[in-house]
Amino acid sequence: MDFETNEDINGVRFTWNVFPSTRSDANSNVVPVGCLYTPLKEYDELNVAPYNPVVCSGPHCKSILNPYCVIDPRNSSWSCPICNSRNHLPPQYTNLSQENMPLELQSTTIEYITNKPVTVPPIFFFVVDLTSETENLDSLKESIITSLSLLPPNALIGLITYGNVVQLHDLSSETIDRCNVFRGDREYQLEALTEMLTGQKPTGPGGAASHLPNAMNKVTPFSLNRFFLPLEQVEFKLNQLLENLSPDQWSVPAGHRPLRATGSALNIASLLLQGCYKNIPARIILFASGPGTVAPGLIVNSELKDPLRSHHDIDSDHAQHYKKACKFYNQIAQRVAANGHTVDIFAGCYDQIGMSEMKQLTDSTGGVLLLTDAFSTAIFKQSYLRLFAKDEEGYLKMAFNGNMAVKTSKDLKVQGLIGHASAVKKTDANNISESEIGIGATSTWKMASLSPYHSYAIFFEIANTAANSNPMMSAPGSADRPHLAYTQFITTYQHSSGTNRIRVTTVANQLLPFGTPAIAASFDQEAAAVLMARIAVHKAETDDGADVIRWLDRTLIKLCQKYADYNKDDPQSFRLAPNFSLYPQFTYYLRRSQFLSVFNNSPDETAFYRHIFTREDTTNSLIMIQPTLTSFSMEDDPQPVLLDSISVKPNTILLLDTFFFILIYHGEQIAQWRKAGYQDDPQYADFKALLEEPKLEAAELLVDRFPLPRFIDTEAGGSQARFLLSKLNPSDNYQDMARGGSTIVLTDDVSLQNFMTHLQQVAVSGQA
């Protein structure tokens, strides 16, 4: 099975598809054994089983029956490839044959619809910032009201609005608009909040109100769950309430920012859900119009003379409030993730709102982080509504309360995960590595929210430390069978249809001695580039940017020294196999990307870009690392061209896709013809068609992209042409003469050609 087919069917893509047989050999490979896995990958031929799975009874195993199991029909038993335990088959599996084979023995990926009941529908808790301009707030209200029509009628809804104070709206009151008002400058605790809202002190463990009405009980005028009511019951009142919202009336002195209690609002929202809906699917959806200016969670002082922190301020420890704000929001993130709740953050302003400090709220829960200039923009409106996209059966594509366990045979141990999840530390698994990459020290992770587009990077360590085992031998009695390492991904989650489901993917990879040609041939350079990029982005959160780039360079050099063909000290002899040849190029563009080169970005922009990158699959991640460039001309059909300054020509139109924005660039000659209006003359219909062609292709790219990319239409000499030029390899820069009508790029960045020349020189010299 090739890389793409495995990804389409199983949602998994490995860096190496044949593993080295020992740990030391794997370490010599430089690029770690790992995979990019999309648990809820959409697949038309996915088998869905309407029953509970058959689970292995082996200690510390709990893996699920799969096609790699050895079935013994005579004894009605099966052997688990993960732990080699023998298990009895249930009575309904007694008459197995080639014609009568259950779905789980036919498919490496299967989904079970279990009989575990769903007791409470999902909860959507809107947290709205009122310190906004009227036009911006009106657009936001319109989008929220539209989104209500996309939610299940039985979904529970809550509403908080805030400015200088936090207002918790009581939707149970039919006759009047009633809300509880809290101080914006106070960090409330669950006990105090519960007592204020119910009149009773909580006495249960962990601050839970054990004697109070809980999520399962009837809503009463004094119960904590009165703030969350079914949409079908409160839709009219909620729409009326939203329509009547107006900007915060608190006066803002000249030279000051509005007083904005974002931290307190999020704290109250998370505590309220913990108090009555712990481990029940819930989303806190925050709409922020600016930075928090009130502690707790203060991002910047209200005086405009105090600027928002920059990357330089953070790196030099001059960001006065940064560490304290990070600590506050990280505490909320830990609470929310532990309770199975999700936080989505939508920013609608030109200013930074503090995404850099708040990023753990979304990154640890699978929530959305979206940075836009205003709530009136198409990017916000369409991206927000795409959050509530539905499948062919009319159910929301979002899934809730996910939990993913990775089971491995004794050949592998799990090092960690990089993606939007949090660790489940209480686990009896025995396949956990002592060395960690990303979120480690566990083989089980919690995903409060996940979707068909959430992908996770998972890293493995070869467990075998000795080279004395025969890698061609597997279990006793299998002399001719290759030695396989088995991995099973078990993802439990709540489907939006109101059912509990389990998605199971089982894969097998051969283990061979180091130096075997099959190992090199199994290298997936695209998956490897994305997984190494995720490690680099993860390192960049704590390490110096220059150190991360040096680490990338060292790993690239070592990989080339290991797998390139060359004569020592002869750069001209350097050759890479086709499945390695693009990897240096990916590394070059990654070094220049906004994920690692943050010079021209704000901390919020960096948090946003890294958030999106660490959730996407291989294809989309590669577009972010190395954008695609397509050329349109009168002479040729549309064709992909090099991401290089030599591709910019006067008589072509270029379409650039960076994932975050899509740009159409008209060459100098094309731009002149367009300004002259030739496209309006019927005799130049071909020119008109040429102008329309990139627009049609751009529209196709926009259909399913989340978040919606920014669209830029520019031309040679235009102010926004810089967005294209900044992404190009500067093979023609101001130090050289432009060739063949190509464009000169004003930059001091090293070109790809010089990068490759230097790589070859260092690799063949034996340096690292």
Swiss-Prot record:
Q: Keyword Cytoplasm, does the record have it?
A: yes
The record's section on Gene3D superfamilies has:
beta-sandwich domain of Sec23/24 (2.60.40.1670), Sec23/Sec24 helical domain (1.20.120.730), Severin (3.40.20.10), von Willebrand factor, type A domain (3.40.50.410), Zn-finger domain of Sec23/24 (2.30.30.380)
Which residues in this protein are found as N-acetylmethionine?
Answer: 1
- A Pfam match is Sec23_trunk
Where are the bilayer-spanning segments? none
Which Gene Ontology terms cover its molecular function? GTPase activator activity; zinc ion binding
Recorded superkingdom: Eukaryota
Q: Where in the cell is it found?
A: Cytoplasmic vesicle, COPII-coated vesicle membrane; Cytoplasm; Endoplasmic reticulum membrane; Golgi apparatus membrane
Which GO terms of the cellular component aspect does the record hold? COPII vesicle coat; endoplasmic reticulum; endoplasmic reticulum exit site; endoplasmic reticulum membrane; Golgi membrane
Q: PTM details?
A: Ubiquitinated. Ubiquitination is required for the formation of the SEC23/24 complex. Deubiquitinated by the UBP3/BRE5 complex.
Recorded hits in SUPFAM superfamilies, A to Z, give:
beta-sandwich domain of Sec23/24 (SSF81995), C-terminal, gelsolin-like domain of Sec23/24 (SSF82754), Helical domain of Sec23/24 (SSF81811), vWA-like (SSF53300), Zn-finger domain of Sec23/24 (SSF82919)
Q: Name one GO biological process term.
A: positive regulation of ER to Golgi vesicle-mediated transport
The record's keywords, sorted A to Z, are: Acetylation, Cytoplasm, Cytoplasmic vesicle, Endoplasmic reticulum, ER-Golgi transport, Golgi apparatus, Membrane, Metal-binding, Protein transport, Transport, Ubl conjugation, Zinc
Q: According to Swiss-Prot or TrEMBL, what is its membrane topology? A: Peripheral membrane protein
Where does it primarily localize? Answer: membrane
Q: Where does Zn(2+) bind?
A: 56, 61, 80, 83
Record's subunit section: The COPII coat is composed of at least 7 proteins: the SEC23/24 complex, the SEC13/31 complex, SFB2, SFB3 and the protein SAR1. Forms two other heterodimeric complexes with SFB3 and PDR17. Interacts with BET1, BET3, BOS1, EMP24, GRH1, SEC16, SEC22 and SYS1.
Described function: Component of the coat protein complex II (COPII) which promotes the formation of transport vesicles from the endoplasmic reticulum (ER). The coat has two main functions, the physical deformation of the endoplasmic reticulum membrane into vesicles and the selection of cargo molecules. SEC23 interacts with BET3 in order to target TRAPPI complex to COPII involved in internalization of plasma membrane proteins like the maltose transporter.
- Which family would the database say this protein is a member of? Belongs to the SEC23/SEC24 family. SEC23 subfamily.
Any idea what this protein is called? Protein transport protein SEC23
Supply the source organism for this entry: Saccharomyces cerevisiae (strain ATCC 204508 / S288c) (Baker's yeast)
The organism's taxonomic lineage, starting at the top: Eukaryota, Fungi, Dikarya, Ascomycota, Saccharomycotina
